[in-house]
Amino acid sequence: MVLIRVLANLLILQLSYAQKSSELIFGGRPCNRNEHRFLALVYSDGNQCSGTLINEEWVLTAAHCEGNKMKIHLGVHSKKVPNKDKQTRVPKEKFFCVSSKTYTKWNKDIMLIRLDRPVSNSKHIAPLNLPSSSPSVGSVCRIMGWGTISPTEVILPDVPQCANINLLSYSVCRAAYPEYGLPATSRTLCAGILEGGKDTCAGDSGGPLICNGQFQGIASWGSTLCGYVREPALYTKVFDHLDWIQSIIAGNTDATCPL
């Protein structure tokens, strides 16, 4: 089975395939306080996701993180002990690849959010640049988030967890999930540890996949049992959506995503 890693009302919704909109990093360690200045904690309708600040006014996350009463928190490390420079925003506008907000297991799970007002750079807040090149298979990638740290129950950490995983060939994910008939090509990335033990999980959806220092992916979906052997996760490929992202930010709200 597959998990769309969303943490709904602090419960993992286990569907026939579920997305990671609310996952914690399974098999990780607490992130360094200063290594995730771009990481956003996103809440909507009782669900938890992550996002990535790409400039003072825009955040990227997963489309399946969409919900009402959304709040976006920046500058967060410990949930219990807020940083003095924490800033909270709500969406001014949300943009999706398609007007119906639909997405598939292999395409269009991306949402671009314009904040109601810009955030200020600070000790714990700074944007992450968009990628300048496409990632290579074999790259070491960093994942992070406040999602559950257990594959079988909801155990949420106070601080974000970080872990290193590997960028794998997309064919590995096709082979791992034959029941979903993934297409031969896709605008998603396949990443994980084939031996298992490290993965995004429920509550981590929408968070970044950072490969060799570049923001390359958005946590989308994966195995119901996070970190399971030979069942890596899939991430929306940021590089393939650069034209769409940059066009929207420039004011061309009619821009369309790549097919």
UniProtKB/Swiss-Prot annotation:
Pfam families, per the entry: Trypsin
Keyword vocabulary terms for this entry: Disulfide bond, Hemostasis impairing toxin, Hydrolase, Protease, Secreted, Serine protease, Signal, Toxin, Zymogen
EC identifiers of the protein: 3.4.21.-
Stored InterPro entries: Peptidase_S1_PA (IPR009003), Peptidase_S1_PA_chymotrypsin (IPR043504), Peptidase_S1A (IPR001314), Trypsin_dom (IPR001254), TRYPSIN_HIS (IPR018114), TRYPSIN_SER (IPR033116)
Tissue specificity: Expressed by the venom gland.
Residues annotated as signal peptide: 1-18
Annotated SMART domains: Tryp_SPc
Cellular compartments per GO CC: extracellular region; secretory granule
GO molecular function: serine-type endopeptidase activity; toxin activity
Domain Peptidase S1: 25-250
Catalytic residues of the enzyme: H64 (charge relay system), D109 (charge relay system), S205 (charge relay system)
Top-rank lineage group of the source organism: Eukaryota
Keyword flag DNA repair: no
Residue ranges annotated as propeptide in the record: 19-24
Cellular localization per UniProt: Secreted
Keyword Disulfide bond annotated: yes
Disulfide bond sites: C31-C162, C49-C65, C97-C257, C141-C211, C173-C190, C201-C226
GO BP terms in the entry: proteolysis
Assembly information from the UniProt record: Monomer.
Family note: Belongs to the peptidase S1 family. Snake venom subfamily.
Function of the molecule: Snake venom serine protease that may act in the hemostasis system of the prey.
Protein name from the UniProt record: Snake venom serine proteinase 2
Species lineage: Eukaryota, Metazoa, Chordata, Craniata, Vertebrata
